[in-house]
Amino acid sequence: MDRATVSLIVLAAGQGTRMNSDLPKVLHPLGAAPMLHHALRAGQSLEPERVVVVAGHGAEAVAKAARAFDESIEVVVQAEQLGTAHAVAQAAPLLADAPGEAVVLYGDTPFIRPETLERMLDLRSRHAVVVLGFEATDPGRYGRLVTRGEELDRIVEWKDATDEERTISLCNSGVICAEAGLLLALVSEVGNANAAGEYYLTDVVALARVRGLSAGVAICDEAETLGVNTRAQLAEAEAEFQKRARAAALEDGVTLTAPDTVFFALDTFLGRDAIVGPNVVFGPGVTVESGAEIRAFCHLEGCHISRGATVGPFARLRPGAELAEDVHVGNFVEIKNAVLDEGVKVGHLTYLGDAHVGEHTNIGAGTVTCNYDGVMKHRTEIGAHAFIGSDTMLVAPVTVGARAMTASGSVITENVPAEALALGRARQVTKPGMATRLMEMFRAAKAAKKKEAP
């Protein structure tokens, strides 16, 4: 099937009152990304020609998050939440002439797999409407899928189901696909004569059957249909996401020495033969190339780590950190918006921000790039093969040339030419015997205070 003819409709209008939050439900973070992004990512696998997000509660924030994922996404607003069919109908003006298929997803159902959506589209060759269903361990209040042989006869919401229909374990996920024009036509015929007075998207199946059209069911694992309506379900979803991410990393040839203690983001990329130690947290935007090692208790976000580099333990890489091949970043080092060229060593207790460090330079313990003047950030440039002595303060903007050195304890406020040695500290003064005399003075003063005390 030509995937260019797929249109995606993502329903994201719900307020999520049970979340007890000012944040729209679909924007709660899951794997360090808005829950909405998970649904969009699954749908993106179909290479849709158009994507329409139906927003409602917090529409402006939802639209911003959707366009942060893909600027081409179109957003419509469902001012009143009158049901799922009503929500899909809001997309009709944008998709009235859309060719090909329409697939409806939900912003609060983050685990639908791309291969599941592919199977749904494959079933479209046999059925006019295809619904995604699952065998529920505890059917509860899910809508039931009533089938006749291999065909789907209708979907019955729990509130409207008979006692016999409630015994059915095949349940509705809400995900549906059909030819775009047909889906919108069926949606326009949906009424609200039901217990909730809502316009149910599920009614399109019965309406299709009235037209003599066939409906079918694609069945997926129940875990894919996990919806998030409460904080407890959000925690459950986070656990499921991390479980999947860890399994995928191991399958892709990554070593996780303590998998259950490593936490991934939605877009984390780890190359084959990368090694990740225990208690590592990946925030958004992290790429770790093949053969790199992240040691225990590191926190990384928005960074790129090249082959052969080692990070940690106890290191923090922030957005804009770029580590070239064979860079070593040791314990209690923080790097932000800084590029470290090949072979740079930053062993411990250092902050490098808004900086560029040339190849094979050594950064001594306690070095700080003083990049902020209270109003603006300034850059530090350090050349190749330089040696920055321990406890050096580099007051930006400042440049240290190639093969230059700074003496330990220096405060560098002026540029250092290539191959020069810079000393920016007071000269040491040594006074023989003064330590003993000072201690005697201090003890005498302390004794005098004790005598004066009442």
From Swiss-Prot:
Its EC number is 2.7.7.23, 2.3.1.157. Keywords: Acyltransferase, Cell shape, Cell wall biogenesis/degradation, Cytoplasm, Magnesium, Metal-binding, Multifunctional enzyme, Nucleotidyltransferase, Peptidoglycan synthesis, Repeat, Transferase. GO terms for cellular component: cytoplasm; membrane. It is an enzyme of class 2 (transferase). Pathway: Nucleotide-sugar biosynthesis; UDP-N-acetyl-alpha-D-glucosamine biosynthesis; N-acetyl-alpha-D-glucosamine 1-phosphate from alpha-D-glucosamine 6-phosphate (route II): step 2/2; Nucleotide-sugar biosynthesis; UDP-N-acetyl-alpha-D-glucosamine biosynthesis; UDP-N-acetyl-alpha-D-glucosamine from N-acetyl-alpha-D-glucosamine 1-phosphate: step 1/1; Bacterial outer membrane biogenesis; LPS lipid A biosynthesis. Binds 1 Mg(2+) ion per subunit. Signal peptide: none annotated. It catalyses: alpha-D-glucosamine 1-phosphate + acetyl-CoA = N-acetyl-alpha-D-glucosamine 1-phosphate + CoA + H(+); N-acetyl-alpha-D-glucosamine 1-phosphate + UTP + H(+) = UDP-N-acetyl-alpha-D-glucosamine + diphosphate. Its cofactor is Mg(2+). CDD domains: GT2_GlmU_N_bac (cd02540), LbH_GlmU_C (cd03353). Residues 253-454 are annotated as: N-acetyltransferase. GO terms for molecular function: glucosamine-1-phosphate N-acetyltransferase activity; magnesium ion binding; UDP-N-acetylglucosamine diphosphorylase activity. Residues 1-231 are annotated as: Pyrophosphorylase. It is found in: Cytoplasm. Gene3D superfamilies: Hexapeptide repeat proteins, Spore Coat Polysaccharide Biosynthesis Protein SpsA, Chain A. Acetyl-CoA binds at residues 365, 371-372, 390, 408, 425. Homotrimer. In the N-terminal section; belongs to the N-acetylglucosamine-1-phosphate uridyltransferase family. This is Bifunctional protein GlmU. It comes from Cereibacter sphaeroides (strain ATCC 17023 / DSM 158 / JCM 6121 / CCUG 31486 / LMG 2827 / NBRC 12203 / NCIMB 8253 / ATH 2.4.1.).
